[in-house]
Amino acid sequence: EKGFGFISPTDGSKDVFVHFSAIQTPGFKTLDEGQRVEFTIEQGQK
């Protein structure tokens, strides 16, 4: 909806900001609440 959100790592570390442009999936780029994903953390502009 907003084009961004947060991912909660399973190791209990701090939530990670994610922008829809970082989602690598064919078609509409969306994630559902509770959906399990794999991710790599990269430093970007704020």
From Swiss-Prot:
SUPFAM superfamilies cross-referenced by the UniProt entry: Nucleic acid-binding proteins
Residue ranges of domain CSD in the record: 1-46
Pfam families hit by this protein: CSD
Keywords (A to Z) from UniProt: Activator, Cytoplasm, DNA-binding, Stress response, Transcription, Transcription regulation
InterPro entries: Cold_shock_CspA, CSD, CSD_CS, CSP_DNA-bd, NA-bd_OB-fold
Induction: In response to low temperature.
Molecular-function GO term, any one: DNA binding
Main location: cytoplasm
A cellular-component GO term for this protein: cytosol
Transmembrane segments: none
Location in or out of the cell: Cytoplasm
Domain of life: Bacteria
Matching PANTHER family: COLD SHOCK DOMAIN PROTEIN 2, COLD SHOCK DOMAIN-CONTAINING PROTEIN 4
Subunit note: Homodimer.
Descriptive protein name: Major cold-shock protein
Annotated organism of origin: Aeromonas hydrophila
Gene: cspA
